[in-house]
Regions:
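Gly/Ala-rich beta-loop-alpha elbow adjacent to hydrolase catalytic centers
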Residues: 75-80, 84
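Conserved loop-alpha-helix segment in the C-terminal half of the alpha/beta-hydrolase fold
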Residues: 195-234, 241-245
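Catalytic His-Asp charge-relay segment
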Residues: 185-193, 220-221
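Active-site loop/oxyanion-hole signature of alpha/beta-hydrolase fold enzymes
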Residues: 30-32, 36-73, 89-90, 112-117
Length: 247
């Protein structure tokens, strides 16, 4: 039995990985899908208050500690690669494997926005300058349409996702991550989503550098033929890959 902790991406919540968690549990594993502060059902916690990357790292470390989890396969999807990495660094003794699911691979001293295409990086920095550190950035409609195009899934599924999307605490995008040598003791793997689509709309692919680094560093590397959000398009497939990597 493996214990999985899956960290969701920007604008989402633990809810979006629940189907994958159910599949993992059906195979006899434990699975946790925590929601980061200010997102999903915890959206209300960021109203009027800045929420940075450090808080999101605290969220994941708290799950590991309070649930008394050890030998964990910690998975960071998209933006979730940032807090997952920070948590693996702080709680390296609890993490067996750190898996990036088309996730951001951070560089110590830099922030998520440093990895973003210029159009979105500028939008976030300008919004924070105008509205202050508690500003929450809405998901651009064009980005949602590129991530889950009309007709790619049943319309009811697409509407349900859109209904649960929440504005993301912008400060978490701009707060730099600071890593220690502890992270080097944690094995890492990368799952690349190859069916593209959103990068053209975004003006660049923010996870491409991490995927290239994974190959250069000799991490275990796998691919899945889905767009950027595999939990939407192939929950069974991404669950199988996670189990394969855990073994």
């Amino acid at each position: 039995m493996t214990t999985f902790v899956i960290v969701h991406g920007a604008w989402g919540g633990g809810w979006e990985w629940s189907p994958v968690a159910d599949i993992l549990r059906g195979h006899g594993h434990r699975a946790f899908t925590p929601t980061l502060t200010g997102m999903g059902e915890r959206d209300h916690l960021s109203h009027g208050e800045p929420v940075g990357l450090g808080t999101h790292i605290d969220d994941i470390v708290a799950v590991l500690e309070f649930e008394r989890l050890r030998d964990v396969v910690l998975c960071g999807a998209s933006y979730g690669g940032m807090p997952a990495t920070g948590a693996a660094d702080r709680a390296a003794d609890r993490v067996r494997l750190l898996v990036y699911v088309d996730g951001l691979v951070p560089v110590s001293g830099r922030s998520a926005v440093d990895l973003f295409p210029a159009r979105y990086a500028d939008m976030i920095r300008d919004g924070l300058a105008e509205h202050g550190p508690a500003w929450r950035v809405p998901m651009p409609a064009a980005l949602f349409d590129a991530l889950i195009p009309a007709g790619s899934v049943p319309e009811a599924v697409r509407r349900d996702y859109l209904d649960r999307i929440r504005a993301h605490p912008a400060a978490s995008f701009t707060e730099p991550i600071h890593l220690t040598d502890a992270l080097e003791s944690v094995p890492r793997a990368f799952i690349r989503c190859t069916a593209g689509g959103y990068a053209e709309q975004a003006g660049g692919d923010p996870v491409a550098a991490g995927a290239a680094h994974a190959l250069e560093a000799g991490w275990t590397y796998r691919e899945i033929n889905t767009p950027h959000d595999p939990q939407v398009f192939d929950a069974e497939g991404i669950a199988r890959l996670m189990i394969e990597l855990a073994n």
